[in-house]
Amino acid sequence: HDLAARVGFNGVAKSSDKLVFGHEFCGKVLDYGPKTRRKLKADTLVCAMPLLNVDPKGYVPTGLSPSASGGYAEQILVQSSLMFEVPNGLDADSAALTEPMAVALHAVRRSRIKKNEPAIVIGCGPVGLGVIIMLKAAGVKTVVASDFSPNRRRLAELCGADVLIDPKQQSPFSSWKELGLLGNVSEAINMGMGIFDKVQTFSLPWVNAMRVGDKL
C-alpha cells in the first residue's frame, strides 16, 4: 500500500494513515448530501459497493482509505448511485455479507466449472468460504479446502468442503493424487502466491485457475 500511494494512487491507505476498516457492511439511511437524489426513505436498510467518490481523488475504497471510513465506524458515507435497498426482509447481519458473497459468486461463474470437476480453494477467509458455498450451491461434487487455521478449516467443512487440507502437513496440490482426482501433471505455472512457488495444472477437463482478491 505504501508503494501504491507513492506512485500516485492517493486513495489507497498508507501504514501511517489513520482509518476505520470494514468494507463488508450494511446500514440504514440517515440523510442525503446536497444535490443527491433521495431515492430511498430514511431508515431504509441498504447495502452499497465499498467505493466512494472523493474529489479530486476520484473513487477510493471504503474501509481502506482515510477518506472513506468503513463499517466499523458509527456512521459512514456511501455513494448513492452504488447503494441499493436490502430486499425481502433480509436481516442486517446476513445482508452485510453481500459484498464477499457477490465476489464469490462472480468467481465461481467465471470459472465455468462443471459439477463433475473438482475444485480447490486456497485460503478459507470470508471470500474463500463464500466460494465454497457457491461451488456447492452450483452442484460441484468435490471441493478441497486448504488453510493453515484449524478454525477456518472447520468453518470450511460447515460450508460444505469435502476435503480439508492443512498446508503445514501436506500440499493441497499433491493431495490430488492421493484422492484419485488427478491425471498426469501437465505443467507448473508461477502464480506469485507468497506461500506457494508453483501451482500445478493437470491434464484434466478442469483447467480453470481463478484468482479472487489475494486467494486462489
Question: For the regions a protein language model found, what residue spans apply to each?
Answer:
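NAD(P)H dinucleotide-binding glycine-rich loop of Rossmann-like/cofactor-binding domains
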Residues: K14, V46-I122
